[in-house]
């Protein structure tokens, strides 16, 4: 049983970029499709199949509506990792006899970078664009990187580690003018910030269910129909999902994703106000009480559900142990098992000391003001204690530049 403190249940969940709790309304919508409405949506000869198919198509239209897409442009997958792989490898395989170059960004999610590395082994040329110290790409650098051999540009909308929002509209405009396909991993922005695939000229977009209060194991790939985008499937079989993704569709999970998208569509404004208020409260109160705390990533051009903070003079891992009543992360959930400093922070030019002290705090739909205040009090008291014990902090206070120290190796 979790301990309770003045109606506050501990530990407090603050890792909304890793996953989100399922919204009770989503759970309620899914349950009948686990029990009485169990039909296969591909069974065309009886009412069990028709009922499941109707539910799938209704969910498909809800997902499409949230990004201004046509219902037929939504392909269901197992999640954003599969969607990213299908988009990048699928385009590369289909168009490789005409073009052989893809552009992405050094700070993309691991699955995008690894899909690109896989293609490099197959002879595709990949350009990894750098990011500025605020985490945003430079549009001129992108323009200059595009050649007549470029088939695809892949840039995520909201970074999973630092929360910065890339200028998708401008990127889409450049890609359309140059005749290059534009893919975006929108998993962290879908349902949280306004995204319009037509206004942004996006050709492919990857979506995840469990980042928007839906179930795990379900996602989608938006694939533009006009002008038509072709991808070679990764999974072959019964030819479901316009031949791009074979396999029996998991009706309950799809219904959950659809319901999560519907709620996000109607409550985005409310959620945004709530998250922005808590972000400002959290950051302002931390800054009032402790010095040398740095927000990683652009303060304004970001999704404010993400606070990635570096605490000078404190080791990130010891900080996480000290604040064990807060469920937080020291990088993306996929790579936080490694003690290497975050590759995203390093690519922003952040030094090893501050990169090692970075912690990502996530705020979401169910975070309360009371939880934020508890978190701030806990963080400030623990930082003070850890800094008292830290020889590095003492040296910094004496004006010693830690970068210039030659550490002896024993």
From Swiss-Prot:
How far does the signal peptide extend, from start to end residue?
none
Principal cellular location given in the protein's record: cytoplasm
Question: Which residues are [2Fe-2S] cluster-binding?
Answer: 334
Annotated pyridoxal 5'-phosphate binding lies at 80-81, 160, 188, 208-210, 248
Any GO MF annotation of the entry:
cysteine desulfurase activity
GO cellular-component term (any): L-cysteine desulfurase complex
Identify which cofactors the protein needs according to its UniProt entry: pyridoxal 5'-phosphate
This protein's UniProt keywords: 2Fe-2S, Cytoplasm, Iron, Iron-sulfur, Metal-binding, Pyridoxal phosphate, Transferase
Mind telling me which InterPro entries this protein's record contains?
Aminotrans_V_dom, Aminotrans_V_PyrdxlP_BS, Cys_deSase_IscS, Cysteine_dSase, PyrdxlP-dep_Trfase, PyrdxlP-dep_Trfase_major, PyrdxlP-dep_Trfase_small
Entry-linked PROSITE patterns: AA_TRANSFER_CLASS_5
Reactions mediated catalytically: (sulfur carrier)-H + L-cysteine = (sulfur carrier)-SH + L-alanine
Summarizing the function annotation, the protein's role is: Master enzyme that delivers sulfur to a number of partners involved in Fe-S cluster assembly, tRNA modification or cofactor biosynthesis. Catalyzes the removal of elemental sulfur atoms from cysteine to produce alanine. Functions as a sulfur delivery protein for Fe-S cluster synthesis onto IscU, an Fe-S scaffold assembly protein, as well as other S acceptor proteins.
Name by which UniProt lists this protein? Cysteine desulfurase IscS
Source organism per entry reads Rickettsia conorii (strain ATCC VR-613 / Malish 7)
Q: What is the lineage of its organism?
A: Bacteria, Pseudomonadati, Pseudomonadota, Alphaproteobacteria, Rickettsiales
